Amino acid sequence: MPLLLSGRKFRHDLEASGCLAINVPLEGGAETRLLRRLKAAGYKTQITSVRGLGDPEAFLLKLHGIRPPHLGHQNVGRNGALGEVQQVIPQVNELLAGEKSVVLWLLEGQVLSRSEILSLCDLCDKEPRLKIVIEMGGARALRWQSMRSFIQ
């Protein structure tokens, strides 16, 4: 990887495909460098892990309920047999409120199933201002490709 990575080709490929699979060097640094370049180009960015994502569309764009762990406590007769449901604010919906495009950088993407990856790609098609970068593992050098070509 060159010392000064301009990020122009990465940004062009991200705008063209909407969803990218990326392999980054294990020593780190490449992802934050690219995120800085994207912020300088006018994108809003958010970095998060895919572990515990569940349904990607509901988690990222819709108000949804979760059931917190009970930790052995009993709440008999108050909330039913399944426990209480807490409403969680969507992760990306507030970022899409403005005019700027949003880049969602997802770590540990190798744990995602093929259907979850396809649903993330479909999210980019539904919302053209949302761009998603998924880290699919480590490599000796920084490389990326379209997510649809990666899963085939």
Curated annotation (Swiss-Prot):
A single Gene Ontology CC term: plasma membrane-derived thylakoid membrane
Enumerate the catalysed reactions.
Answer: a plastoquinone + NADH + (n+1) H(+)(in) = a plastoquinol + NAD(+) + n H(+)(out); a plastoquinone + NADPH + (n+1) H(+)(in) = a plastoquinol + NADP(+) + n H(+)(out)
Q: What class of enzyme is it?
A: translocase
- EC numbers listed for it are 7.1.1.-
Q: What keywords are assigned to this protein?
A: Membrane, NAD, NADP, Plastoquinone, Quinone, Thylakoid, Translocase, Transport
Q: What role is this protein assigned?
A: NDH-1 shuttles electrons from an unknown electron donor, via FMN and iron-sulfur (Fe-S) centers, to quinones in the respiratory and/or the photosynthetic chain. The immediate electron acceptor for the enzyme in this species is believed to be plastoquinone. Couples the redox reaction to proton translocation, and thus conserves the redox energy in a proton gradient. Cyanobacterial NDH-1 also plays a role in inorganic carbon-concentration.
Q: Report quaternary structure and partners.
A: NDH-1 can be composed of about 15 different subunits; different subcomplexes with different compositions have been identified which probably have different functions.
Entry-linked HAMAP family: NDH1_NDH1N
Protein name as annotated: NAD(P)H-quinone oxidoreductase subunit N
Which species is the source of this protein?
Prochlorococcus marinus (strain SARG / CCMP1375 / SS120)
